[in-house]
Amino acid sequence: AKQGYTGVEFDEYDTDWNSEAYSTVAGQNANNSVRITNDFMTAVEQDQDWSLYWRTELVKSREEDREPKACQTLRASELWEQIAYAAWASADPGLQFDSTINEWHTCEVDGPIRASNPCSEYMFLDDTACNLASLNLLRFQNENGELDIERFRHAVRLWTIVLEISVLMAQFPSRRIAELSYEFRTLGLGYANLGTFLMVNGIPYDSEKARAICGAITCIMHMSAYAASAEMASELGPFPGYERNKDGMLRVLRNHRRAAYRASDREYEGLTIKPVAIDSQHCPPELLQA
């Protein structure tokens, strides 16, 4: 201690989100995402103002049947530039397109999708959980460097069953999360090592062919998992929340099918922005036929 000091001064901080305490936190070792709507993108294009609201204020204003009070208003284009620069400089934040996400929501009767897990691969209702599994694509590459489609489909079917079983075996952090997980039985199957799969075949990661391959593999995995789910439902019955969400779920599945078969924009149901269909020009024939 230095002689002559009779006391020590400590900086004081409060817990307000706009305080100095939060502004000095670097946010390292975390995944950060920003959720934006179609209205925000329109405001960016038209260089309009955009108001920000506390979530608590939005809830309170709905309860009190009044217009919410904005905590800040700024130019949408300026905010968009800040998001873009931060993503370029640090790979964060990611973007979650709220309007599109909810237009592809399979259980919209039970509420909107408002959030995701930190990595954003799981998006569903509040207070739900999902066990995740990934298939290593490189393990399904045959001697010609192509995806062994039948082996891949078989693995997808097996792991869909494994993840279904895991719902019963999982431990949940709260009673509500456990109950909703049983109610909807969400499964999280994906794949990994796409970059290596492309690299060993000499395909640039950022290329039309790579995107076509990625889209086709995702389509095969997605619909094979749904087929396995339907197979289990035919024996055991659908998940408890299915019947009240049946119309929305079947609409989403029909839209997935239309994207796979390159349907015209007018055929899609309930979509503001139409999906990019499978690229038949750049997709390898064996994946396209699958």
Range-by-range predicted roles:
Residues 1-157, 168-180, 214, 225-290:
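Active-site cavity-forming subdomains of large catalytic enzyme subunits
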Residues 208-226:
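Short secondary-structure subsegments characteristic of cysteine-rich extracellular domains
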